[in-house]
Amino acid sequence: MLTWKAGKSARTAQNGKLQFRFLGSSGMRTLHWIALFLLAVGPAAAADLDVTSMGAVGDGKTDCTAAFQKALDAVAAKGGGIVNVPAGHFRIDGRLKIPGAVTLQGTFRTPPTDQREDRPKLDGSVLLAFAGRGSRDGEPFIRLAGSTATLAGLMIAYPEWKQTDVPPVPYPPTVLTQDTVNTAILDCCFLNSYEAIRYQSAARFLVRNVHGYPTFRGLYVDACYDIGRVENVHFWPFGVTYKPDDPFCKWVNVNGVAFEFARTDWQYVVNTFCFGYGVGYKFSRSQAGSCNGNFLGIGADSCRRAVLVEDSQYPGLLITNGEFVGRWGSDDSVCLEVAESASEGKVSLNNCSFWGPIDRCVWLRSPAVQFTAIGTHFREWDVNRRGIPAIQLDAGKAIVQGNTFGRGDLHVLVGPKVRSAILMANQAAGGFNVDNQAAGRTQLVANEQNILDTSETAKSHYRLDIGAPDDNRYVRKCFAPESCQYGERSDKTIRWSTSQTEFHLPVLRGKPYTVNLDLNLPQAAVDPANGLYLGDQRVMELPAKAYLGTVTGRLPACDKDHVILTLKVKTWCPKDADPNSKDMRRIGAALCSLTMKADGAGDGVTNANTGDAE
C-alpha cells in the first residue's frame, strides 16, 4: 500500500521499505532507490530471441520449421517480444504460427526485392516456403495467430516455383490472419507467392512497405469492420523475366488480381502500385458484403482492368490521384469498369490520369451507381480506332466536371438508360465531343467548343489536316498520326485508314459541298468498291490504280448540321507486301487532308484543327 506523509517542508511516499522524499520548501527533490522501485512496480521486460539459438540454420537445406516455432512460442510464453531472423536462407518445410504480441523480425527495414543483376542471389533474411504445393486450400504458410502479431523485415520465396508452369501451381496464402485485431505485415517481399496476403475478420490491420509479384492474388480483405490500412505496397514482376507475350506473364495479366477488397469498412489505401495483372484493384461482394473506403495515390500499369467495381457500399469508393494504364499490347483494356452487378454506392475520381493502350477509360454499366470524374486527365483511349468514347455511360448517374481530354475522337457517350448526366467545364482538343442518347436527361454546360460549331462562315469552307493536332473531333476509326513519307508532303502528317474510316463533319443545311481528299492509295488497296460514302450513296470514287494526290467528290445538300461520311478502302498488311516490315496492321490509304467547300463560299478557308482563318 502506498501512503503519503506531509510536513512543513517535505512529503514522503512510502511503499513497504521504499521511500521517496520530496523537498518542497527548498525546491529540491531527492529520489532514492529509483531502479529498485521501477523493478518492483513496472512490467517485466519483453523477450527477445534469435532463431539460431533454437537451432535454426540459414543454409537453405535444413528444415527450420521446429526451431522457428519453438522460438515464437517461447517469446509468447514470456508475454510477447521479438524473434529475430538473421541473414540467411531458412528452409521451412511446414507452417508457422506467430502468436499474439510477437514479432517475427528479419534484417530488412525497407521492402526488399530480388537482385535483378544476379537473380539467384537473395541477401538478407529469406524464408524458403515448401508447404501446400498444388492446392489453394489448407493452412497458410504463416498465420498471424493472435492480435498484434507482426511479420516484418523478411523475404519469402517458393523454390519450387517455375515460370514455365502455366497455369501456375497453386498454394495456400503465404500469410493469413483471421479473427484478430491490430496485426501487421511490414517491410516484406513476397517474391513468387500464389496468393500473398489474406485478411479475414481482422480489424485495424496494417500492411506497409510490401513488395512482390504474387501470381493469383496479392491482397484479399474481407469481413474487416474497423479501418484496415494498406500503405506503400508495390506488386511488380520481381523475380520474373517479364515479357507481355510470355505465357506465364500473360496468364497473370489476364487472371491475376493485385488487390481485392470485399467487405471492409473505412478502408484506407495509400501509395500503392501494381503492374501486369488482369485486375489491379477489384471491389467484390462476399457473404459479408462489399467495400467503402479512401484510395489515395494508387496506380495500375499494364492491367486489363485497372479498377473493377463489382459492388460497393453506399458511402462509396473515393479514388484520388490515381494513375491508370491499359495492358501492354491489348485492345480491350478498360481502366475503370463499374459492373452491372454493382447494387449501390458512388465511385468518385478526383485528379486522376489515364493513358496507354486503352479501349475505354471509364465504363459505367450499373443502373444503381453514381459516378463522378473531377479534375481528371484522359490522355489516350480507343486503341482500336473504332470510335469508342473515353467515358461510356450506359446507365446510372454521372457528373463529369473540369476534366481534360487528349488523343481520341469521342469523349463521352451518354446511353439512353442513363438517368442523369451533368457534363460541365470540360476541355478537349478540337472541342468537347458528346454522343448524347439520353435527350434532356443530359446537361452540357460551359464545355470547350469548336469554331465550326459556332461560325457559319467557317463552316462554309474549311480544311482538316489529318494527323495534325486536334483532328480527332472529325476523324474516327483510323490509325494514330504519323509522319508523311511522300515527296512534297514530307512535312505533313497522315493517318492510315481502316476499312471504314469515318469523317464527322459540320455542314450548312441545304448547301451542296465540293469535297477534296488528299491521299496516297497504294496498289494493294485498290478496289472497285473504294470510295467516300454518305450512307449507301457514294459521293466520291477513288482511282482504279495506285494514286498520290487529290480526289474530288460532291456532297448533296443535307437537312442536318452534321454528316458522317464513310471512307471505304480495301485493307492490306505491310508485312505481306514487305517481308522485312514489322507492321502487322491491316491498313487502307494514307490520308493527308480533307477540304469542304459549300457552293457559293468565298476563297477564305478556315483551318478546322486550329479554328484560324487562312
Descriptions of predicted regions:
Residues N450-P512, D518-D527, W572-E614:
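Glycan-recognition and processing domains
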Residues P111-P112, Y158, Q163, L191-N192, ...:
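Residues in short coils/turns that link rungs of repeat/solenoid architectures in beta-rich domains
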Residues V51-P86:
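Acidic Gly/Asp/Thr-rich repetitive segments characteristic of extracellular carbohydrate-active
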Residues T150-V254:
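Right-handed parallel beta-helix
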Residues R109-R136, G153-P173, V230-V257, S284-S286, ...:
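Acidic/polar low-complexity surface segments
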Residues D48, G80-I82, A87-H89, R95, ...:
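Detector for repetitive beta-architecture
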Residues Q69-K78, F90-Q105, P111-A152, A157-N182, ...:
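Extracellular beta-strand-rich solenoid/capping regions of secreted or surface-exposed proteins
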Residues L72-A76, R91-G100, D114-E117, P140-R143, ...:
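Short, T/G/N/S-enriched strand-turn elements that build extracellular solenoid repeat scaffolds
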